[in-house]
Amino acid sequence: MTENFPLPPLLGVDWDHLGFEPLEVNGHVECTFSTTTSCWTEPVFVTNPYLPVHGLAPGLNYGQQIFEGMKAFRNPSGDVQLFRPDQNALRFARSALRVAIPPVPTDLFLRAVNTAVGMNTDFVPPHGTGASLYIRPMAFASSPTVGLFLASQFKFCVYVLPVSPLHGKATQEGASVLVIEDFDRAAPLGTGNVKVGGNYGPVLGLIDEAKKQGFNLTLHLDSLSHSLIDEFSTSGFIGVLNDGEVPTIVVSDSQQVVSSITVDSICELARAFDWHVQKRPISFLEVARFSEVYAAGTAAVLVPVESILRRSTGEHVVYSVEYSSPTSCFSRLSTALRDIQQGLVPDDRSWIKLVTKP
């Protein structure tokens, strides 16, 4: 910590019961791209959370929009740190190229994120609460047009809000999962592997209906054969095989899923434990072989799965493992990941970036 930076957490906020609803913060960051200049402007901090956008902007009409998800944590010393932000910058650029948005250079992306977080450090929850500051970079085509033409103006913004873990009790007790069978999330050679809103809007109703039926998560199979596991609606899929001398972490190599930074981090930690890691097609028939299953993502971090139901076949797999046991693979992996994110152990992999005063 330096003098007056970062600011301590605000008083009067119930940091232990934040939920995931927006809370008014100090402001956000904006940058603009114009084909006239062919470059992004420098980050500007804006206090008004609302954006003046033309109703005919392609970002509103044609889905020419991308986003990211990141988190900032307060470490034991009171400093604020980001987890692998360079990887978010690279994924943001890949998403931009898919929908004809000028990629935001990595250095500009990181400066914009640093400014957005640095101007809101009083909203970073206290260390040890389990809460964090969620960071939402997003970009969209903003110039008005009704034709399918390349846009001439674009907006890049970074919003932040303090949050609790996404799935609440399921994070500790285990999530119940429903396989979605009447909707394909993504097609081969489509947009499933980038973070565009069009991948998420169509599943909102499915997620809501599943929750009404008592399910915490929804799982998608591949659209070609409906026999392979792709990912959960909002997070990556991780399975654990315990039929050898050491555990084997199994993740999908599908080209229809988002390249998950959390999944990649879990795989790296597993290798550090001298466990095996397999990245390959995952048959749905394998869910009964797994000793443990997790949903992994920025918002959820790592959520243990208690059961998976596929109604069309009557398959209902229940995992009897005690996830809270310190000997479970879940406990070892989730503890190792959280300890790094929250600054409890040395950063041997250079995954952590401290937020500096803007």
Swiss-Prot record:
Q: For this entry, list what GO says about its biological process.
A: amino acid biosynthetic process; branched-chain amino acid biosynthetic process
- List residues modified as N6-(pyridoxal phosphate)lysine: K195
InterPro entries, per the entry: Aminotrans_IV (IPR001544), Aminotransferase-like (IPR036038), B_amino_transII (IPR005786), BCAT-like_C (IPR043132), BCAT-like_N (IPR043131)
What is the top-level taxon of the source organism? Answer: Eukaryota
EC number(s)? 2.6.1.42
Residues reported to bind pyridoxal 5'-phosphate: R91, E231
- So where's the catalytic machinery, residue-wise? K195 (proton acceptor)
Q: Name one GO molecular function term.
A: L-isoleucine-2-oxoglutarate transaminase activity
Q: Kindly state which keywords UniProt assigns to this record, in alphabetical order.
A: Amino-acid biosynthesis, Aminotransferase, Branched-chain amino acid biosynthesis, Pyridoxal phosphate, Transferase
- So which cofactors does this thing need? pyridoxal 5'-phosphate
What practical purpose does this protein serve?
Pneumocandin B0 is the starting molecule for the first semisynthetic echinocandin antifungal drug, caspofungin acetate. Pneumocandin B0 is a minor fermentation product, and its industrial production was achieved by a combination of extensive mutation and medium optimization. Inactivation of three of gloP/GLP450-1, gloO/GLP450-2, and gloM/GLOXY1 generates 13 different pneumocandin analogs that lack one, two, three, or four hydroxyl groups on 4R,5R-dihydroxy-ornithine and 3S,4S-dihydroxy-homotyrosine of the parent hexapeptide.
Pathway-wise, it operates in:
Mycotoxin biosynthesis
Reactions catalysed according to its record: L-isoleucine + 2-oxoglutarate = (S)-3-methyl-2-oxopentanoate + L-glutamate; L-leucine + 2-oxoglutarate = 4-methyl-2-oxopentanoate + L-glutamate; L-valine + 2-oxoglutarate = 3-methyl-2-oxobutanoate + L-glutamate
Q: What does this protein do?
A: Branched-chain amino acid aminotransferase; part of the gene cluster that mediates the biosynthesis of pneumocandins, lipohexapeptides of the echinocandin family that prevent fungal cell wall formation by non-competitive inhibition of beta-1,3-glucan synthase. The 10,12-dimethylmyristoyl side chain is synthesized by the reducing polyketide synthase gloL/GLPKS4. The thioesterase gloN/GLHYD exclusively interacts with gloL/GLPKS4 to maintain turnover of the polyketide side chain.
PANTHER family noted in UniProt: AMINO ACID AMINOTRANSFERASE, BRANCHED-CHAIN-AMINO-ACID AMINOTRANSFERASE 3, CHLOROPLASTIC-RELATED
Q: Tell me which family the UniProt entry assigns to this protein.
A: Belongs to the class-IV pyridoxal-phosphate-dependent aminotransferase family.
Full protein name: Branched-chain amino acid aminotransferase gloG
- Origin species, per record, is Glarea lozoyensis (strain ATCC 20868 / MF5171)
